[in-house]
C-alpha cells in the first residue's frame, strides 16, 4: 500500500534451500520496497524496516531467510546443538523434513548471507518447537551465540517477535504459551 513512500528500504529474500553442506552464495537480488515487492517479503521484516527507516532517516537493507514451519534446530549447527547444555540432544536432532533437520537451513540459507554487514536480527519462530518447548530457552541462547559468532559480533542485537496465539489441532493448549515463556526467559541470557 504505502511501500512506495519508502524508497530507502531494500529487501533481499533468501531462496528456500536445505543443504547438508555449507553454501557460500545464493541466487537472489536486492529489491526496492514497492507495493508489488513487499507482498512477497516478510511482513514482520518489512514493518520493522519501515519503522527503522522512519526513525533513523537512513537507507535500510532487510535480509529475510525464512521457512514457515521450521524448527530452531534447522537454523543451528549440529555442533551448537551438541554444546547446548541440559537439552534432550536426541530429540533436538530428530528432524525429518527439510525445514526441521538440524543445520540444513543454517547451511543453505544463513551462511550464504553472512558476508553481508548486519546490525541485528529479528526472530519470529517457535511454533514448530511446541513439542520440545522445555528445550527452547537453552536452544535459543545457543542460536543467538552461534549467529553472533557467525557475523563476528558478540553483541549484535537480537530481537524476537512474540508468537501469535493459535490453537494447533491435537495440541496441548499449554505448549505454545510455554514456548513464548521460554523465549522471554532466554532474553535474560542473550
Where do the protein language model's features map onto the residues?
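Cell-envelope and extracellular/periplasmic
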Residues: 1-190
